[in-house]
UniProtKB/Swiss-Prot annotation:
Lineage summary: Bacteria, Bacillati, Bacillota, Clostridia, Peptostreptococcales
Any single GO BP term: translation
SUPFAM superfamilies in alphabetical order: Amidase signature (AS) enzymes (SSF75304)
GO molecular function: ATP binding; glutaminyl-tRNA synthase (glutamine-hydrolyzing) activity
InterPro entries in the record: Amidase (IPR000120), Amidase_CS (IPR020556), Amidase_dom (IPR023631), AS_sf (IPR036928), GatA (IPR004412)
Protein name: Glutamyl-tRNA(Gln) amidotransferase subunit A
Length: 491
């Protein structure tokens, strides 16, 4: 089996059976990245030296018969908005181009404690604001399935790295679909956990009440194992889950979907949905029915205002969170200025890209006197309504099934001139963040042009175990993940 085809489970098994060393695996991925990432641009920083040093330590442990952890010897690539001690963390922005954090984010600490090896930091839309990874200050990431297409965003670097076989596990953040939409575009599994299940400490904030960290993997089983490591209370994040969740997500993963109640919201299958995506999702629904799931169409009236509410709330929070980047304490400082006010103005003008400025201006506007009630308050009222709508839906259904994105991966540069058209790529994902519930995107088919299509399963708060069981049952029957390693050979 080629290294780019291996799952986390394959690698763990290989270590147990002494088929290869940790150094072999890490070196194999590094060689592949060096050979092919010049075409894809998935990485901002490659951590070759430190990764090989950590691999040598783990090999020594294995030779002594010691345990190396749930993710022992698994290379992982981290989105470049999560703090990594001693490793540059830029948020793909000129503002933080030279920022080296003095500490690890909690997610990074947990991965390291489980034996994972940080292989690099991945490209993204600047400050996680975008749906195509075209807003990075440094490079445009390309979709490994078709180098003329975008990989989705904002975690496009992580999705592309996983799809290209540069790592068996990558980490992203999801504010309005930034894990699930790139997962759909790149043909991977991508999970946005329940808000609070995974600590946000050390994640550079975009919209604090919406942001959540999650994994990209090749298979649902890999995703379940990764979540096992990532989840849990963190005293450094007051919004993290208070009790320590003890769910073993891998155990009983093969429970099956017989008797599972699946809701299909009719609002997600109306005008604007690509016909090939619609057909692919409908085929997957038939498969669920054949497996014994109880499938029913129902109304989930959140799509009309969800996108508007999301962009109001997220931009408002961004304008506040990004106020700290003023050239005073850290981040970019303008070289030419007269006085403190001009220094701040010039630093922000030079440090932030066009999309970030657009959202800061929008956020400042909706929070300003005279407009707060008309926009921000209405959006927060809609948020409350959305939570209640989902709560009511989960009284009748175990999971909700929708397309992940209304469109196929689009051509690089196609939507950059029309922000509203770009924002519409998130129409099926934003409401999940507004409600704070978990959702997973899994591959469910391909277009005629062999572009991946993703299917989204949404669960109730903290129902990840049931959600992963449903995703696993469908994944195993569809068998699409088996096709992917061969397709991932980047030409």
């Amino acid at each position: 089996m080629k290294i780019e085809e291996m799952t986390i489970m394959d690698i763990r098994k290989g270590y147990v059976q002494k088929q290869f060393t940790v150094k072999d695996v890490v070196q194999g991925y590094i060689d592949r990245i060096k050979e092919l990432d010049g075409k894809i641009n998935a990485f901002i920083t490659l951590c070759e030296e430190s990764a090989l040093m950590e691999a040598a330590v783990l090999d020594e442990k294995l030779s002594r018969g010691e345990e190396i952890g749930l993710l022992g010897g698994i290379p992982v690539a981290i989105k470049d908005n999560m703090c990594t001690q001693g490793i540059k963390t830029s948020c793909a922005s000129e503002m933080l181009a030279d920022f080296i954090p003095p500490y690890d984010a909690t997610i990074v600490k947990k991965l390291r404690a489980a034996g994972a090896i940080i292989i690099g930091k991945t490209n993204m839309d600047e400050f996680a604001m975008g749906s195509s990874t075209e807003n990075s200050a440094f490079k445009v990431t390309k979709n490994p399935w078709d180098l003329t297409k975008v990989p989705g965003g904002s975690s496009g670097g992580s999705a592309a790295a996983l799809a290209a076989g540069f790592a068996p596990l990558t980490i992203g953040s999801d504010t309005g679909g930034s894990i699930r939409q790139p997962a759909a575009f790149c043909g991977t599994v991508g999970l946005k956990p329940t808000y609070g299940l995974v600590s946000r400490f050390g994640l550079i904030a975009f919209a604090s009440s919406l942001d959540q960290i999650g994994p990209f993997t090749k298979t649902v089983k890999d995703c379940a194992l990764s979540l096992q490591v990532m989840q849990g209370n963190d005293p450094l994040d007051s919004t993290s889950i208070q009790q320590e969740p003890m769910d073993d997500y891998v155990k009983d993963l093969d429970k099956g979907v017989k008797g599972l109640k699946v809701g299909i919201p009719k609002e997600f299958f109306q005008e604007g949905l690509n016909i090939e995506i619609s057909d692919s999702i409908k085929e997957a629904i038939k498969v669920l029915e054949q497996l014994g799931a109880v499938v029913e169409e129902f109304s989930l009236p959140v799509t009309d205002s969800g996108l508007s509410a999301y962009y109001i709330i997220s931009s408002a929070e961004a304008s506040s969170n990004l106020a700290r980047y003023d050239g005073v304490r850290y981040g970019h400082r303008a070289a030419v200025y007269e006085g403190i006010e001009e220094m701040m103005l010039n630093s922000r003008s030079e440090g932030f890209g066009k999309e970030v400025k657009r959202r800061i201006m929008l956020g400042t506007y909706v929070l300003s006197s005279g407009y707060y009630d008309a926009y921000y308050k209405k959006a927060m009222d809609f948020r409350k309504k959305t939570r209640n709508v989902f709560k009511k839906a989960f009284e009748s259904y175990d999971v909700i099934l929708t397309p992940t994105s209304p469109v196929l991966p689009f051509t690089i540069g196609e939507k950059t001139g029309d922000p509203l058209e770009m924002y519409l790529a998130d129409i099926y994902t934003v409401n999940v963040n507004i409600a704070g519930v978990p959702a997973i995107s899994i591959p469910c088919g391909f277009s005629k042009e062999k572009l991946p299509i993703g299917l989204q399963l949404i669960g109730d708060h903290y129902s990840e175990k049931k959600l992963l069981q449903a995703a696993y049952g469908l994944e195993q029957e569809l068998g699409i993940f088996k096709e992917m390693p061969q397709q991932r050979e980047v030409k």
